[in-house]
Amino acid sequence: MMHPVLTDWSILFFCQELKVVFPNSQRMNRGGQVISEIVESCRSHEITDLILVHEHRGQPDGLIVCHLPLGPTAYFGLLNVVTRHDIKDRKAMGKMSEAYPHLILDNFTTKTGERTANIMKHLFPVPKPESKRLITFANRDDYISFRHHIYEKHGGPKSIDLKEVGPRFELRLYQIKRGTVDQSEAQNEFVLRPYMNTAKKQNSLGV
């Protein structure tokens, strides 16, 4: 996982928390490296996925997920980011766990939605059955809500205490390319066209 030269604490905290969200990940500053050098370095070290975090004036505003070695690459706008450091009531939060999480992928029913869900799914190893960590990607009207929880069982199977861990954010998919992020000539698989003239709004990811 890489991010630009840091200009604000918000992007720093967010990237630190993403490192825990995605198991087995490493966080690096991009510095002056060009994208092609980063991708080639990842390939040579047999890294399976590259996540690039973009920022504007220190605030995270974009996420690129590139599957290696051949793609695809998904581009997302990043909205409504709330890090653990932004939450005042820390006592109400659960502790960050590094166990492999169970995934909930909700309402990715179209072809593009299934493709997006698969891109996200491959960022996470298979969890152990006893893992008490949950990560949710829930699609509503093409905005993907990310939530991170842990749970504890108390007594019967229906008695579950769910605690949000953070961070939380929304994703807006705007492009999927068949190749890797450094391949400008790669064919587009999906491009968001929000200003298309249609009588009825068609959701791209789900119902």
Question: What feature does the model see in each segment?
Answer:
Residues M1-V207:
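Phospho-regulatory, Ser/Thr- and acidic-rich intrinsically disordered linkers and terminal tails
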